[in-house]
């Protein structure tokens, strides 16, 4: 197994500890991932697909002759690992879930518990209004109001913010088809409050929009830590639970953004444009969206949180 793969599994083990999982689980889960990594070697773990997992299932069941309960535990560990990769924005989808759903009965019994948590507008309001720190409030509001990824947020520089036009210009990435996203008056208010005090923290003349306490660019892990802590304080995140629906992280903000725009009746094409989803079909290239109409629709549909 390559060095970077070893480091990835070690980071996953540390994440299990941070989540408060039992010590035995923190040892067994990474061991299960290592065994799978050796099985698919030299393919990287991030590139594993359903075919690899079905082959591994066959190997465990027919060659190793493991009992059903043991196989289910192995795939539970793998599913948790790939959920972690999604959280770290290293992959887009968990390849384990479809295999569990079709071939492992335990997954069918617990499928509902593996759904990503969706909080209500009222809970989002409670979350935001519980935040006292101006930086943290601006971070959470931007994540909720724009649906941008954690990595996109941390890569923002101060110069990427246009308060007059209420837009963010994101850095180019392979995951996003657009670079300009909108925010509303509530997010603008939070940003203004943060920018007013930002210079006091900018002891290293860093261009980043969001700074750490040391005056350096805030990293993804820092954003993840502050979001989960704030959510835990208001009862929206349970770090000791293995159930996905009891966790709340920056990616849940993107889930919240998308789902509540859908529920408010916004055009799905507009939502895809705001999310920056990559266009997969040739006809999508010809689907030009009017930016003024897009902005007006966004402002009409984005939920208000009463800050």
Go through each PLM region and give its residues.
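Short, basic (Lys/Arg/His-rich) helix/loop patches that form interaction surfaces
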Residues: 224-269, 273
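DNA breakage-rejoining catalytic core of tyrosine-based enzymes
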Residues: 91-93, 104-125, 175-186, 202-206
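N-terminal core-binding DNA-recognition domain of tyrosine recombinases/integrases
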Residues: 10-24, 30-110
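Conserved tyrosine-mediated DNA breakage-rejoining catalytic core shared by Y-recombinases
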Residues: 155-190, 281
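Catalytic-site neighborhood detector that most strongly recognizes the C-terminal catalytic loop/helix
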Residues: 275-300
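C-terminal secondary-structure termini that scaffold catalytic or DNA-interacting sites
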Residues: 1, 301-307
